[in-house]
Amino acid sequence: MGMTITEKILAEHAGKKEVHPGELITAKIDLAMANDVTAPLAIKILEKYGIDKVFDPERIALVLSHFVPAKDIKSAEQAKIVREFVKKHGIKWFFEEGEGIEHAILPEQGLVVPGDLVVGADSHTCTYGALGAFATGVGSTDIAYAMATGEVWLRVPESMKFIFYGKLKPWVMGKDLILYTIGQIGVDGALYRAMEFDGETIRNLSMEQRFTIANMAIEAGGKSGIISPDEKTIEYVKQRAKRPWKVYQSDPDAEYHSVYEWDASQIEPLVAWPYLPSNVHPVSESTHITIDQAFIGSCTNGRIEDLRVAAKVFEAALKQGKKVHPYVRCIVIPASKAIYKQALKEGLIDIFMEAGCVVSTSTCGPCLGGHMGVLAEGERCISTSNRNFPGRMGHPKSESYLANPAVVAASAIMGRIAHPDEVVKAETLAGV
């Protein structure tokens, strides 16, 4: 029996010829990552046990991303702990506040390549699976162990395969494909399983949209999300990689827990209503819902393609004399400094600001209800982020709706959840 791409990567890193689902292994890692929320806990664990040396300062990445710029004294002290650890151990890959969100930075910097085994003290570490790597989130104790030893202990997951075929409708993006997937299988439908995505539709997606899909694998309970490398992957990696890579593909006779196959041409832009990412509805069934805030950003949809799509909608509105609805505040946060600079170069930031958006430095910010866009009681936000649990973006009685950047931009203009065609087609009809 053949192996899946996930099993091949894990076998290689465990020093075995093959591994099987359910098998417990100790595997060598290529990179350990933590942020300003999770790294201080790991650092305290290392100090508690008197561990004063990391396994390799060039194989650890620490990113200040969640509560930056520091929102209060506690978050400032958290960041200070990380900075002092970086200086003490000579950590090479340290990213200060404003550099961006880890799940945008690490691929940009070429710190994750195909065939890698990456562990990160953040649940959305699965994002890197878009590069054909096995990447998974772990707790601060596990990341402390990984930083000390260069190893991780885990159970080999079963794999599930999701095949999409057909041409996407206008305004349908990778975000809609992953929302559709979660809507079909539920938030525990892939519990501790590797979610492998394939099919002509996936192959036609940009790397940015593939990152979005892998990013939200955890929202279905997935241990990881992964897409086998192809020409697009290699082209992306060639320009960035800091070290050699190895391409793995699933064997034709690999065994899967289950295989799903869907016609993507039948999917329209979707919205996940509160309070689960699986509570998915078409935009056409959501247009009665008014909003107070719109957020475009996060590690899910804060990349340059996302900003371009949103800017297209805002630009169409501006040509009609429309801006962000007077009762709505719209926050745009590029996922990294590099993305911010590119957006400036392309004139996207000018469009956002002219349309009435607030544009901020790269940070996780409102996604986790941290700061820079926290919701009050009873407020509603439509967001390009990845979670909409009670209190996720602020008050426990606030509501978060998840959608792609085009839908969020259109909603910001209309003051309610809206299909992008309501703005962009209106421009065409008006002859503007």
From Swiss-Prot:
Enzyme class: lyase
InterPro entries: Acnase/IPM_dHydase_lsu_aba_1/3 (IPR015931), Acoase/IPM_deHydtase_lsu_aba (IPR001030), Aconitase_4Fe-4S_BS (IPR018136), Aconitase_4Fe-4S_dom (IPR036008), HAcnase/IPMdehydase_lsu_prok (IPR011826), Homoacnase/IPMdehydase_lsu (IPR006251), IPM_dehydratase_rel_enz (IPR050067), IPMI_cat (IPR033941)
Top-level lineage group: Bacteria
Biological processes annotated in GO: L-leucine biosynthetic process
Keyword Ion transport: no
UniProt similarity note: Belongs to the aconitase/IPM isomerase family. LeuC type 2 subfamily.
Function in brief: Catalyzes the isomerization between 2-isopropylmalate and 3-isopropylmalate, via the formation of 2-isopropylmaleate.
Protein name (record): 3-isopropylmalate dehydratase large subunit
Provenance organism: Aquifex aeolicus (strain VF5)
Record lineage: Bacteria, Pseudomonadati, Aquificota, Aquificia, Aquificales
GN (gene name): leuC
